Amino acid sequence: MIEKIWFDNHFLGKLLWPLLWPLSCLFKWIATKRKSDYQSGKKQSYRSSVPVVVVGNITAGGNGKTPVVVWLVEQLQSKGYKVGVASRGYGGKAPHYPYLLTETTTPDISGDEPVLIKQRTKAEVAVAPVRSEAVKMLEQQGVDFIITDDGLQHYALQRDIEFIVIDGKRRFGNQHYIPLGPLREGVERLSSVDFLICNGGEPQENEVSMRLQPSEAINLVTGERRSVSSLSNLVAFAGIGHPPRFFETLNQLKANVVHTQGFEDHKAFEPTEIEQLMQYGEQLIMTEKDAVKCQSFAQSSWWYLPVDATFPEEKAQQILNKIIEVKE
């Protein structure tokens, strides 16, 4: 319901205005003061010896940051660089922090997105509630670049390159601060970053167009690959920042979806609640992010759909050149 207030001008927004407006003003004041304290030197920030690239946004919710992180890691790896990824590890509870992921780390330890990134890229991935601690651990691994998944507002960590990922269709909603609107920072922040990435929709001036390109569906148990359109009576579910984006992708792929179910982002699934969805169809299809949480109890009729970030070739080269210049 809160997203309907933020993005759809729902009438409840007007009813709740007297309650939410003061809270939004308080959020804005705290966020602005925190940023000012770090930038003025009143609070100490950490400067890494390794170039730090931040991929974040100015709104709450899922905008497509993780596919951008994966793309950056893979592109830099293809040029021979060793890349590390730092994350807060939201949704996980590690035995200690900072925590360096291994091939067998599960989402309940590190959170779902770090596991996805580790499995996709084989990069060094570290998590810690204080991101600078994760960065310090990655420095010890001898990485050439560190990419932070989210953390644009984590001013305790200095950075060399900043990306803001924008949902090209929902944009910035009603342009109010949390909780009345989706903003973590004001839209004026857009003018101070290195790259604005527009995920879907029509990119505005100075924005780089990005598309999420789906590949074949992959079976969670067997690893078999099949076109989505060849799967029948699908039940689709997603526990991501904006589930309708996933359902729309399936529709564009002409998937035979008979039921959809959205869950909150980073949800820790119980086997029974996913198994219950099977009553609506013959097979399940989910996002790659959800698949890492369902892998341990998956059934042979469960599939996931990976997506890859794609950019115009010229823009992709500009992005990589600017990052590599920092290293040189």
UniProtKB/Swiss-Prot annotation:
One of its GO terms (molecular function) is tetraacyldisaccharide 4'-kinase activity. Its EC number is 2.7.1.130. ATP binds at T59, A60, G61, G62, N63, G64, K65, T66. Pathway: Glycolipid biosynthesis; lipid IV(A) biosynthesis; lipid IV(A) from (3R)-3-hydroxytetradecanoyl-[acyl-carrier-protein] and UDP-N-acetyl-alpha-D-glucosamine: step 6/6. It is an enzyme of class 2 (transferase). It catalyses: a lipid A disaccharide + ATP = a lipid IVA + ADP + H(+). The keyword Lipid biosynthesis applies. GO terms for biological process: lipid A biosynthetic process; lipopolysaccharide core region biosynthetic process. It comes from the Bacteria. One of its GO terms (cellular component) is plasma membrane. InterPro entries: LpxK (IPR003758), P-loop_NTPase (IPR027417). Keywords: ATP-binding, Kinase, Lipid A biosynthesis, Lipid biosynthesis, Lipid metabolism, Nucleotide-binding, Transferase. Transfers the gamma-phosphate of ATP to the 4'-position of a tetraacyldisaccharide 1-phosphate intermediate (termed DS-1-P) to form tetraacyldisaccharide 1,4'-bis-phosphate (lipid IVA). Belongs to the LpxK family. This is Tetraacyldisaccharide 4'-kinase. The gene is lpxK.
